[in-house]
Amino acid sequence: MTSSAFQSLPRRVGVAAIAIPLIIAAAMAGGHWFFALVALISGLSLYEFYNLAERRGAFPQKSVGIVAGFIVNLAFTYERLQVDVYNYFSDMGIHLAMFSQMQFLLFVLLIFLMVVLMVELFRTKGSPTVNSATTVLGVLMISLFYGTLISTRELFPYGFPVFKFFETGFADDVQMAMIERWGGYTIVSLLASIWICDTAAYFGGVRFGKHKLFERVSPNKTWEGAAFGFVSAVLTMLLARILVLEYLRLHDAIILGLFVGVFGQMGDLIESRFKRDSGVKDSSDLIPGHGGFYDRFDSLVFVSPFVYLYIDFVVLS
């Protein structure tokens, strides 16, 4: 550990001691609390990404992108939101025809794209192509991917096939509470797997690292460290299955661990590439001792879509 890293250790530990319990509490609570947490992290990560793009001469439409990103995040709570909106208007005697979740998401992305292109007609800064591309990329890569994390939590209980896991074919209050807990435990286990993967990759690389993984992008990362991270991610998900995720089969836990071990480290490399291209070490200094939100959650961005798709279309189908 370098002297600067050692000096920042108390701040890092202090921030982690506050942030980790809050994240766990929001994950277990689900609903609006978890949405608010993810939307906040998503918005700040997107802001940092746009700042990186600006350092390379782009002029992304920050306000448009951040607002669109929030609505994209909101789209992943649409089933819950749809019920609230429909009931609100029904109480006033108004019966609305509602979008499906996919229709709403596509509508939001279509309007967002049209607004970005129209705004560039009136701007005189930079390249319209580069400005539009960076604005759209940020929302698709960050907001959309974070949205799938929200959707993963929303599967419990809204997308949970009770008939598949309970012999009665329906869930009583105790079983519904169990399903809710599974949702929170799934998110917490995913985060734990990512953090343990990162930690194991770092210390494994320091102790045993000899062969560079991707020197042009991240000179300190090694194949040996990546292997330690990969194995640790799988073992963490297997342990989570034994302790709290009883609905997972053995191979499900292994596959989810594989997603973390592969796509989590890939996400870290991709963010490192963006930062190196922009000539900075951290995406920001918003989190004392940790850098920026994009720095801390870069792995989560790329893992979340694969976890959501697998749980929704394989585990719960």
Please provide the spans of the model-predicted regions.
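Membrane-embedded alpha-helical bundles of polytopic integral membrane proteins
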Residues: 2-256
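Hydrophobic alpha-helical transmembrane segments of integral membrane proteins
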Residues: 17-18, 284, 301-302
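Juxtamembrane interface at the ends
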Residues: 201-202, 206-207, 272, 276-280
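Interfacial loop-to-transmembrane junctions
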Residues: 277-299
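Hydrophobic alpha-helical transmembrane segments of membrane transport and translocation systems
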Residues: 301, 305-310
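Juxtamembrane boundary at the C-terminal end of a transmembrane helix
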Residues: 309-317
